[in-house]
Amino acid sequence: MTNTRKNHPLMKIINNSFIDLPTPPNISSLWNFGSLLGACLTIQVITGLFLAMHYTADTTTAFSSVTHICRDVNYGWTIRYLHANGASMFFMCLFIHVGRGLYYGSFALLETWNIGIMLLFSVMATAFMGYVLPWGQMSFWGATVITNLLSAIPYVGTNLVEWIWGGFSVGKPTLTRFFALHFILPFIISALAMIHLLFLHETGSNNPLGMSSNSDKIPFHPYYTTKDFLGLLLLILLLMTLTLFYPDLLGDPDNYTPANPLNTPPHIKPEWYFLFAYAILRSIPNKLGGVVALILSILILAIIPFLQPSKQQTMMFRPLSQFLFWILVADLLTLTWIGGQPVENPFISIGQTASILYFSLMVFIMPMTCLIENKMLKW
């Protein structure tokens, strides 16, 4: 008798990805975040779909439609806050997922890593456009400031910005196209995530020791399905706590004021998950230089595999690199804090110092430390 699970064309793909997948026996809870990101994406698509049923992408009614969702639609407030805080959970999982990749040397799996960087950019673009949709003060001015950065591109900058705006300022055409793009991008992200998994399953997962585990693997189900389910329960617990008890904790009060092009908020800032990049952008006095630094702050991940001279893949047994990794984490937290502060001293100088440290660690200090560690181990 043939086993349907192993022979059916569709079931076979699911079976080889989530059931009979040979997995290293020693991967820790930090490997849970891939499945949690899948769960976050699912939550965002479902809640987003229900929100789109009631939302109107028009400058005159967008703000009122969000108010209508929260006040008049059955459990509309729950869906809205699940979607808003779900984005925060998404980025929290993303940052831990990337951090785990850096710590354990998962960037050695080049195709998987590069698709991951594309995913990161796509999710950031989607989140930015989603923040514009409620059409509050911070939505409008955030959109104005960030899209206006493209005007720093020599020669074509101004034309490019006006083309994106659909006019001479952020307005109805901008909101309409942002809604269309915000709706379609999660499906593109889903496709990229599948390619990400495809490449991962070509090579197999990395593990905390960074050694080949081909001689000793266990099936994904029931071991890691159970483990992932526990992670999912904890994620839902955190998301529901945030949504039901502190729904506005991570939001900006300015976004409860309808967008007004004639009144600039005293301090324009994006959501918390973009603050580190925003701080790097602001720390450079030159506009074009700031934009380049902003893009490089993420794109630098793409050159990490070529800046890694260590003979050991993971940082598990490299205390100097471990120390620098946690310095990098502290630096990113500092940048996040600075991004939310006004542009005045001492915040300017702290931001500039933290930005220099960020790039120095990534490009120079960490690779040099790898060479020192190799030398100490006489490799």
From Swiss-Prot:
- Which CDD domains did the record assign? cytochrome_b_C, Cytochrome_b_N
Membrane-spanning segments: 33-53, 77-98, 113-133, 178-198, 226-246, 288-308, 320-340, 347-367
Write down the membrane topology. Multi-pass membrane protein
Q: Where in the cell is it found?
A: Mitochondrion inner membrane
The residues listed in the UniProt record as binding a ubiquinone, with positions renumbered to this chain, are H201
- Keyword Transport set for record: yes
Q: What else is known?
A: Heme 1 (or BL or b562) is low-potential and absorbs at about 562 nm, and heme 2 (or BH or b566) is high-potential and absorbs at about 566 nm.
| Family that this chain belongs to | Belongs to the cytochrome b family.
Specify where it is mainly localized: mitochondrion
Query: Which cofactors does this protein require?
Result: heme b
Q: Which organism is it from?
A: Lepilemur randrianasoloi (Randrianasoli's sportive lemur)
Q: What does the subunit comment say?
A: The cytochrome bc1 complex contains 11 subunits: 3 respiratory subunits (MT-CYB, CYC1 and UQCRFS1), 2 core proteins (UQCRC1 and UQCRC2) and 6 low-molecular weight proteins (UQCRH/QCR6, UQCRB/QCR7, UQCRQ/QCR8, UQCR10/QCR9, UQCR11/QCR10 and a cleavage product of UQCRFS1). This cytochrome bc1 complex then forms a dimer.
Q: Which domain of life is it from?
A: Eukaryota
Enumerate the InterPro entries for this protein: Cyt_b/b6_C, Cyt_b/b6_C_sf, Cyt_b/b6_N, Cytb/b6-like_sf, Cytochrome_b, Cytochrome_b_C_euk/bac, Cytochrome_b_N_euk/bac, Di-haem_cyt_TM
PROSITE patterns, from UniProt?
CYTB_CTER, CYTB_NTER
Give the note describing cofactor binding and stoichiometry. Answer: Binds 2 heme b groups non-covalently.
Function, please?
Component of the ubiquinol-cytochrome c reductase complex (complex III or cytochrome b-c1 complex) that is part of the mitochondrial respiratory chain. The b-c1 complex mediates electron transfer from ubiquinol to cytochrome c. Contributes to the generation of a proton gradient across the mitochondrial membrane that is then used for ATP synthesis.
Which residues does heme b b566 bind?
Answer: H97, H196
Q: Which residues form the signal peptide?
A: none
Q: What is this protein called?
A: Cytochrome b
